[in-house]
Amino acid sequence: MGQDKKNLTAAAAAAYVDDSTTWESFGLDARLLQAIDQLGFENPTLIQSSAIPLAIEEKRDIIAKASTGSGKTAAYSIPIIQNLLQDESTEREIKSIILVPTRELSNQVSQFLEKLLIFCNSKIRLINISSNLSDQVINSLLINKPEIIVSTPAKLIQILEKNVNSNLINLSTVKNLTIDEVDLVLSYGYLEDLQKLESYLPIKKNLQTFLMSATINDDLNDIKSKFCSRPAILKLNDEDSNQNNLVQYYAKTTEFDKFLLTYVIFKLNLIKGKTLVFVNNIDRGYRLKLFLEQFGVRCCILNSELPINSRLNIVEQYNKNVYNLLIATDETNDFTIQEDEKDEGEEIEENKNEENDGKTSKNTKKPNQKKDKEYGVSRGVDFRNVACVLNFDLPTSSKSYIHRVGRTARAGKSGMALSFVLPLNEFGKHKTASLSTAKKDEKVLRRIVRQQSNNGFEIKPYQFDMKQVEGFRYRAEDAFRAVTQSAVREARIKELKNELVNSDKLKRFFEENPQDLASLRHDKELHPTRVQTHLKRVPEYLLPESARADHKKIGFVPFHKNKVHKNRKRKPSGRKPDPLKSFRPK
């Protein structure tokens, strides 16, 4: 099982592993131990060795703070399953609720739980009600009273309110409540849903609670007071282990030069490994994709307009190295702007101006734009082996920046983050390439630098050698002119149609034929209105000297080649001699 076992191994860095503890020391069920061994977990991580005994033996509530890749999911999943296996009750009841902020994360948590339940799935059943299932299918699954429910807060409340007068879903029997990525759950505006959930749960009884997050702040106090009693607070001090793994840069550039530099970076393969590019809106993502496609740079898009099945498949294929370049739309900025201003302590007048700007920007948003409110990629989703995070558009808050760069340098691996920053005096000079949020780039950068400095991290300025890049400018301008607003709109419609077809295939055909899933790709070219095939080839004279191929000098080559045939006998010049005149008698 060698190679498969390595592929299933959780992304826990060596710095997080607790070699002094074994899984057998927790007294886990044999079926659970067998599943853990099949996953390739040799030893528990530090957060697991601290949380699991407290949760199983002492039945304590757990509030855990640890970095991405430290094993937080297993830290709450294993105690939940162990307690359910020890439960001698024979009645089918809903006993555990796991809440996550996004549908993508709910899918990943469900897949991980299914691997842990592989040897005991007849006793413990699991349902992910945030998956793309109809209400009728979900209701039919809930009738069987699954022991574990994974959901987003909004979806769970929706089902509870629809079935308030029926006995379809009863949470009075729940013994465990888990909120994963609790800080993001709050920033997504789920606090009201959590308050509604309080009335459905047996909080005054023996309800065990897990609150897991990479950051812990004052916003957590309200949740802690509602759902926890005498919690054990675990903080894994892993800043030192992460500090040397992530290298952060920012580059000040103009609006159009963002596209120019991105073209040069990916066409010349200046970044080795997989890259995650963040943009601030959906149109921006398609504009960048159409721009890069003209140079033969293949990439795929991830945004809230795509069907959930397609989004999950894109993340899965990206993690399997099917794609090396993913353009993700981060639409969480609106939730964090005001929070970030309060946390960073900006001046009152500056806050007022920014709030007013925020209001006007909200009013100018396009109506009737259907988006999935439970979409999120900048935090929580497990992007594996990301070598670089490129902030093509700088986020509007330092919190969002932390969430983005947290997708790389995970689990002890090295990574790099590069952010493009637009100086204020360059804003609006290139209207087609302009973005409204870029007006505050310098202000946001100051907050980011200050916050990272307080945490012991450094963001270094990076200066591109524009003399080397200048030769590519005319090609970039030619390609950018082809990406018109109508081309972007047509690309969005075409992509949505393709993904709707793909989503239907994923839902039906590929469930029965998983081996054919590899044939479904999401990085197909969308083509702008004007296709210019010559742009896909980079002439050698544009390359820097270090990147040019070494050719032997062959000397001077004349324009006209002498027509000399070496193998043909040389003809005598002039007329042939007359044999009568040349004949001489002896």
Curated annotation (Swiss-Prot):
Region described as Disordered: spans on this chain: 339-375, 560-586
A cellular component annotation (GO) from this entry: cytosol
Alphabetical list of Pfam families matching this protein: DEAD, Helicase_C
Single biological process term from Gene Ontology: maturation of LSU-rRNA from tricistronic rRNA transcript (SSU-rRNA, 5.8S rRNA, LSU-rRNA)
Subcellular location: Nucleus, Nucleolus
InterPro entries: DEAD/DEAH_box_helicase_dom, DEAD_box_RNA_helicase, Helicase_ATP-bd, Helicase_C-like, P-loop_NTPase, RNA_helicase_DEAD_Q_motif
Compositional bias ranges of the Acidic residues kind: 339-349
Basic and acidic residues: bias regions: 350-360, 575-586
Motif window: DEAD box: 180-183
Keywords: ATP-binding, Helicase, Hydrolase, Nucleotide-binding, Nucleus, Ribosome biogenesis, RNA-binding, rRNA processing
Basic residues bias (residue ranges): 560-574
SUPFAM superfamilies in the record: P-loop containing nucleoside triphosphate hydrolases
Role description: ATP-binding RNA helicase involved in the biogenesis of 60S ribosomal subunits and is required for the normal formation of 25S and 5.8S rRNAs.
Protein name: ATP-dependent RNA helicase DBP9
